[in-house]
Amino acid sequence: MVGKIAPIAVDAMGGDHAPGAIVQGAVNAARKGLPVVLVGPEARVREELARHRAASSLPLEVHPATEVVEMHDHPGQAMRRKKDNSIRVCFDLVASGRAAGMVSAGNSGAVMAGAILVLGRPEGVERPAIVSVLPALKGAPLMLDMGAVVDCRPIHLVQFALMGEVYSRRVHGVTRPRVAILSNGEEDTKGTDLTRAAAAALRRAPIDFVGYCEGRDLLTGEVDVIVTDGFTGNVALKTMEGTAKVVGEYLKRALRSTTVSKIGGLLSRAALEGMKKRIDWREVGGAPLVGVNGVGFISHGRSDALAIENAIRRAGDAARTHFIDEIARAVAPSHALLEVPADGAATEQGPTPRRIAPPRT
């Protein structure tokens, strides 16, 4: 996307490979013209920057933060007691308008707590959600929530759907996103009290709600926004990550098993590299937060320079769309949607939803 924005604030001290990999990713992004401000202990960050040639000529600055949130710290307490920590300072920069968004590979709970504490929520939003972009056969479907709210009520799922629809449309450019709730079957009778209540409400919402989708539909790309509670979403995400790793190892072993397979592997290297890139979580970079008054991205704790660079790029893309302006309007009718009309015309199960089409071959 084009258009100038304020820098993206990057938590230089977040993640297993901080500050080295974080600074490297920020430098890589800055070399491509993306403005970045690194936040952390100034002397340490500048020492790391000095390792990079001509870094002083890049659109990259350093903003001091004297404290760091450790992975074992309690998120809420860390935000309140360590008021000059690098995560909170990143959010302070966003709140003041000096940064267009922030990226952190640090304590994800602290990032969520900091977002709520410093940025606050748009009017009407009950709970923010973490969004994941899935490596589907086509498109870039979103799934939320991925761990922010593990014990959900129907209002949460309804709002996740409405916020996810806005993000898909405004940030990913999907004209009319297809929205579904993750369930154990497509039939109306499937699911739980939670999913059935949310589905009944969403059938009355001004979005393209297509009903339930199953786990097998996650990566087909037939649905643009997949809604679930944070517990289920996180388990599903980790399952997909683990499956991709195991399949990759199986493929590697198979291609090394015989001379013929080794030759076949060499001949198909370009295709295999393309597939590997498609499912590489580092290409996504980070998971955006929706439901807070600012752009925030949570990156994997194992993020390397490539992941951080991509997270910065995606945060910039999101900031340019000003999608947050539409969130409050989108969730405004959510409580009314959950109310059963007095005439009883709309029941909890509602009309039969359209079935999700099988993946195109």
Swiss-Prot record:
Q: What's in the keyword line of the UniProt record?
A: Cytoplasm, Lipid biosynthesis, Lipid metabolism, Phospholipid biosynthesis, Phospholipid metabolism, Transferase
GO terms for biological process?
A: fatty acid biosynthetic process; phospholipid biosynthetic process
Pfam family for this entry, one: FA_synthesis
Keyword flag Transport: no
Q: Name one GO molecular function term.
A: phosphate:acyl-[acyl carrier protein] acyltransferase activity
EC number(s) recorded for this UniProt protein: 2.3.1.274
**Under the cellular component aspect of Gene Ontology, which terms does the record hold?**
cytoplasm
* Known pathway: Lipid metabolism; phospholipid metabolism
Q: Which domain of life is it from?
A: Bacteria
Q: State the top-level EC class.
A: transferase
List the residue ranges of the region (Disordered): 340-361
Write out the catalysed reaction: a fatty acyl-[ACP] + phosphate = an acyl phosphate + holo-[ACP]
Q: Which InterPro entries does its entry note?
A: FA_synthesis, Phospholipid_synth_PlsX-like
Its localization reads: Cytoplasm
Q: How is the subunit organization of this protein annotated in UniProt?
A: Homodimer. Probably interacts with PlsY.
The family annotation for this protein states: Belongs to the PlsX family.
Q: What role does this protein play? A: Catalyzes the reversible formation of acyl-phosphate (acyl-PO(4)) from acyl-[acyl-carrier-protein] (acyl-ACP). This enzyme utilizes acyl-ACP as fatty acyl donor, but not acyl-CoA.
Question: Can you say what this protein is called?
Answer: Phosphate acyltransferase
